[in-house]
Regions:
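Solvent-exposed beta-strand/loop surfaces, strongest in extracytoplasmic domains of secreted
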Residues: 1-178
Length: 178
């Protein structure tokens, strides 16, 4: 009778027999009443079977639709020291259709090169789901040092444009070839 939420209806239709193990007919020999009209979502459903006509007595049974398990996993991220943090994201596994679960992501404080935990938090029970949260890691790598330009060997900006011998050149004391 019990079922795990799967987006489908789980309406239990009881089979009723008398003491001689004769199968009784719904509507003629007994009636069935349910405590709800929602047979899809998580909850406890009470079923009341009442004798009718030649049969008397009432029997009550309950069954449950229990939450489906969902996992939210923070995705690992990397950045170089001094850069802004990447956007924190997570993957959700186990929801059905367009269903969503709510959660918040944050990371352990710190900016030095190293590893920092990315935490994901939210309610454990969300509607039709029981949610498990899995942390990720932000790795901050060391920044490489830029040696810059050697002052003895200047690195002029090249534009790629062809230079012709200029007619208005001024002698600056250095040799120039065209």
């Amino acid at each position: 009778k019990d079922a795990v939420y799967d987006g489908n209806e789980h309406k239990w239709i009881p089979t009723v027999t008398d003491k001689a193990d004769k199968k009784l007919k719904a509507g003629t020999d007994y009636t069935v009443e349910y405590s709800t009209s929602d047979f899809t979502n998580v909850g406890t459903i009470k079923v009341t079977i009442t004798g009718k006509g030649n049969y008397t007595g009432t029997v009550t049974r309950t069954y449950k639709i229990t939450p489906k398990s969902v996992t939210v996993t923070a995705e690992d991220k990397t950045k170089v020291f001094g850069e802004t943090d990447p956007k924190l994201t997570a993957k959700v596994a186990g929801t059905l259709g367009n269903d969503t679960v709510e959660y918040k992501l944050s990371r352990e404080t710190g900016e030095a090169a190293g590893k920092y935990e990315i935490t994901v938090k939210g309610d454990k029970l969300q509607g039709n789901y029981t949610v498990t949260y899995v942390a990720g890691t932000l790795t901050i790598t060391s920044q490489s040092i830029d040696p810059g330009t050697d002052p003895e060997k200047p690195n002029p900006d090249y534009t790629g444009a062809k230079v012709n011998s200029p007619s208005d050149a001024v002698y600056d004391g250095k040799e120039h070839k065209w």
